[in-house]
Amino acid sequence: MFAIDEVASGCRFVVTDRHGGVSTAPFDTLNLGGHVGDDADAVRRNRGLVAEALGVEADHLIFADQVHGDQVVHVDGPWTGRPPSCDAIVTTRADLALAVLVADCVPVLLAAPDEGVIGVAHAGRAGMAAGIAMRLVDAMRDLGARTILGRVGPSVCARCYPVGELLREQVAELWPVTRSVSWHGEPSLDVSAGVLEQLWPHCFDVEQLPGCTVERDDLFSYRRDRRTGRFAGAVRLVEQERA
């Protein structure tokens, strides 16, 4: 169920894999995306399994309606009605787990356990270029976060993400660190490098979690498979162990 499961200083970072759910091919088995053509009941059950493993109620595992933008929304409880269209969410609620859906884009997971603030962002090429990770940090600071821990989850690597020369240069003009080349020598982008560039000046501890979605068959990848599911990166606050 979890490709990565880390408890660190009062927070828990997880990245799901594609195993342990109930969806059938090509969404087998732990698809968490409700917009990909999978059976809605299977998605609901899969999300319930992840929520249970995280120790929260099913409706307390919070997803947004991701739109490849740069908007951040403050969450104060389970959604009533349709989730808002945004690509980052923040909360101070310890009974909520925040999650983002990905299948090549970068899941950004942030926590400030000492101040009781968490946030997540879905950083695709467009969102990264627009500074979604920095906007998430700013929103967390507005809620009192000071010492921020960050985890940047698995995504498509630069070697597997060829783009046109013009697009690469447009993005690299904003974030030079993203300029790269593919396995075949084509122009490419390193989106996760751009995310890390945005986070490093503002976070106490940032780590890139290993794995390329195209190269790892235990993770969903739209670029590799097209018709496929979505995995999630999630974070929640947990009680810190007392010495």
Where do the model's predicted regions map?
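Active-site microenvironment for binding and transforming phosphate-containing groups
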Residues: 1-243
